[in-house]
Amino acid sequence: YFTLTSNWFVRAYNYYKDIDKFVIIIYLINQGLIYFRQNGVKIDYDTFYKDKTIEINKINISDISKDLGVPKESIRRKVLELEKEGTIKRIGKKIFVVRDTLYSSRATHTLTEIATILHEFNKILKKEKLVNEVYSVNEIIYAIKENFSYCWYQFNKFWFIYIGRWRVELKDLEYLAIGMVVIINAVKNKKFFPKNNMRLYHKALM
């Protein structure tokens, strides 16, 4: 899970050198997923990303600011930057996520990482005799892709809550990205061991 989290933030930063810009794009794309869910429409992965733009009607800066927990002026500035870069287009109150942006933000790596996590959970459930079968990572990826609009709506719903909680704590998602990289590297370091007395450890660092 921490690998998924760390990789997601690193990839988000690599897209625009600004995590909040990427979060705004994902937020806009998610409006399409919400529309499909509200209308009982199921879209698979390939159909969702094929030869299309996403049109978001009557969305304003205040809505994005409130939902993401980012000041309105910051959202306005970043949306203008995304528009100048050609990442999105605005016509009146409508915002269009252009095809190239949609295609480049495909959830390829994240999808594989989520499937890997679910596969590990599946093995635990099998070991505890709560399920009878263990599905491979590829089988899970296929199932998610076939039910993509529903599955990715649920993931984004969780992800925005997760991001929002960290934003309250740290104010800046770049700090979280750096912290995650440090944690992952520490855990993978065979010489790493937890400190028994964190208070004394922090005092020593000071």
PLM regions and their residue ranges:
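A short alpha-helical element within helix-turn-helix/winged-helix DNA-binding domains
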Residues: D46-K66, L82, R199-M206
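Short, cationic-aromatic polyanion-contact patches
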Residues: D44-T47, N60, G92-T116
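Short, charged/polar micro-motifs that form catalytic or ligand-binding hotspots
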Residues: V10-N14, I54, I61, S65-K72, ...
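Short, amphipathic alpha-helical interaction segments positioned at domain boundaries
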Residues: Y103-I140, E146
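Short recognition helix of helix-turn-helix/winged-helix DNA-binding domains
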Residues: Y1-K42, Y142-F193
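Short amphipathic alpha-helical interaction segments
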Residues: G69-K84
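Amphipathic, Lys/Arg-enriched alpha-helical "gate/interface" segment within cytosolic domains
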Residues: K42-D46, Y103, F192-A204
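A short, conserved structural fragment
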Residues: E83-K94
